[in-house]
Structure formats: structure tokens, C-alpha cells
Regions:
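Short coil/turn linking the two alpha-helices of tandem helical-hairpin repeats
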Residues: 5-9, 93-97, 129-131, 148-151, ...
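Residue-level recognition of tetratricopeptide repeat
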Residues: 81, 116, 150-153, 186-187, ...
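Canonical positions in the second alpha-helix
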Residues: 109-110, 143-146, 179-180, 225
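"A position-specific structural signal for the A-helix of alpha-solenoid helical repeats
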Residues: 87, 122, 158-159, 193, ...
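Preference for long, solvent-exposed alpha-helical segments and helix-linker "stalks"
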Residues: 1-104, 113-114, 234-243, 257-277
Length: 277
């Protein structure tokens, strides 16, 4: 790959070949790593693979703008070449370049040939960017149904929930977040997402104090998030601190004959029972 990097510096047109060289080297390293049986060999090969990845990422080629410029015309020329389209999708996903037109075009072309969860997600993001929510959600549903891996299914459900939340479709967003939880109960992110949904729409009653009780349900979800997933504890604790300031005062609740320890059911689309504290 070092030779490829030198070639690229002297010839800008060599960028795509540099990517091909990276994919080849990375594939060889992956294959060797999978075949290794001795722990020491595995460690050495893992270091080699990490070095290859780091070399590519730091090369200057691995930018979304570069990939868009390289792949946009090539995807158009290779609309029926499934192997090439998969390669484009893989590289752009690896580098988080999933908002580029080349990624969308490759996903749509590949999906027409051989529908997979990954191509469906690419199409889903494309229609999200275009503002067509019906098609966006339809493709994400396809991704969830096509995916065999439980954790990836959960991730697609979570992403669908996040997209719906961004469009203020709260009830539907909650359904997908709950689906993500049912598929992966150890991920705290869907709970945090639901908490933020509740906090974004706390009003369901004519009584201001009851509306403030929504924040108890918000905190319930945040506490659940950090109990199942310690990796989100810091984020959850910050949000708990923020939202706790919005809960009702004892005096507000007194006039409603409510006190600490009482249960209250949050109405509207939330439909959850929480405890006053």
C-alpha cells in the first residue's frame, strides 16, 4: 500500500486504484485473521489489519467528497455490476459517507438486482433526504425484515425510530424504539430516544402540574437506559439532571391531592404510569 500511496501522490487519477489496493490488502488481512488458530498470530494479524485501516483512513483519499467524486460516474457505468456496487456501498459505509449521492445510487441499483438489508437502508436514507417519508420507512421496514442478525435488526429499528422522531411522528417513532428494545434489550439508546420523545411533547392535560409529571416518565426511561447499558450512563445522567428541573413542586401537586409515592398515568400518546418523587 505504501507503493500505491506514492503512485497516488504523483497521479491524482490513481485514487480509485489506491482504494482497490486497500480493499485487497484489507481482505487478505481479514482472511488470515479468520484462519489463524494461535493467539499470538491473531494478535499480530490484528495489529497488521489495524495498521492497514489507519494508513487508508489517514491517506487523504478517505474523505466523503473524494469518494463521491470517484464513485459517482463509476456507479452510473456499473449499474448492473453487483460486485462493484457492493464494493462501493461497503467502502462508503465503512467511512460513514452514507449521505453522498454515489452511496444512494449504488444502493438503489444494487437493491434492484439483489435486495439486502444494507441496500434497503441506503435507499431508505436516500428517500429521507428527498423528503419522501413513506418510501423511506418502507425501505427501512424491508431492511428489518431482510436482516438475519438480531442486533442489526435492532439497530435498523432504532434508526427508523430516530428518523420518525426527527419528523415529529412521535407515536410511530416510539413503536420502532420499542421494537429495537425487544430485539436488543441491552442497548440503552432506544430508551434515551423514548425519553427525549416524551420530553419533546410533555403536555397532555389542562393541569400544568400534571404535564410536568411527564418528566417523571422521562426519568424512568433514562434510569432504565443506564441500568441495561452502562455505556450510556454518562449521557443518561446528564439528561436526568436536566429534566429533573422540570418536574412539579410539592406545592403544585398538593392542590391535585397528589404527593410523593403516588402513581400518575401520563395520558395522550405516551400512555405510561409513573411514580411521583
Amino acid at each position: 500500500m505504501d507503493a500505491a500511496a506514492r503512485e497516488m501522490k504523483s497521479d491524482e487519477a490513481y485514487k480509485e486504484q489506491f482504494i482497490q489496493d486497500y480493499l485487497f490488502a484489507s481482505g487478505v488481512a481479514d482472511g488470515a485473521l479468520k484462519a489463524a488458530t494461535k493467539e499470538n498470530d491473531k494478535k499480530l494479524l490484528k495489529v497488521a489489519k489495524d495498521n492497514i485501516d489507519a494508513f487508508f483512513i489517514n491517506s487523504g483519499v478517505a474523505t466523503c467528497d473524494n469518494l463521491q467524486a470517484i464513485y459517482a460516474p463509476k456507479v452510473e457505468q456499473n449499474k448492473t455490476n453487483l460486485d462493484y456496487l457492493k464494493q462501493v456501498i461497503s467502502v462508503m459505509q465503512m467511512l460513514n459517507c452514507t449521505e453522498q449521492e454515489a452511496y444512494f445510487a449504488a444502493s438503489e441499483a444494487a437493491h434492484a438486482i439483489e435486495p439486502t438489508a444494507e441496500t434497503a437502508v441506503g435507499c431508505g436514507y436516500m428517500y429521507y433526504k428527498k423528503g419522501d417519508m413513506d418510501k423511506c420507512i418502507d425501505y427501512f421496514d424491508q431492511a428489518i425484515n431482510l436482516e438475519q442478525d438480531q442486533l442489526k435488526k435492532a439497530d435498523y429499528a432504532y434508526k427508523t425510530a430516530a428518523i420518525l422522531f426527527s419528523k415529529k411522528q412521535l407515536s410511530k417513532a416510539k413503536q420502532y424504539a420499542l421494537k429495537a428494545i425487544s430485539l436488543d434489550g441491552n442497548n440503552g439508546k432506544p430508551y434515551i430516544l423514548i425519553a427525549n420523545m416524551y420530553a419533546s411533547s410533555p403536555n397532555w392535560s389542562d393541569e400544568a402540574a400534571l404535564n410536568k409529571c411527564t418528566y417523571f416518565a422521562v426519568i424512568d426511561k433514562l434510569q432504565k437506559a443506564k441500568s441495561v447499558d452502562p455505556s450510556v450512563a454518562e449521557e443518561a445522567n446528564k439528561l436526568i439532571s436536566t429534566y429533573a428541573a422540570h418536574t412539579p413542586k410539592d406545592a403544585d401537586l398538593f392542590f391535585l391531592s397528589l404527593k410523593k409515592g403516588d402513581s400518575v398515568t401520563i395520558g395522550g400518546w405516551i400512555g405510561e404510569t409513573t411514580t411521583i418523587r
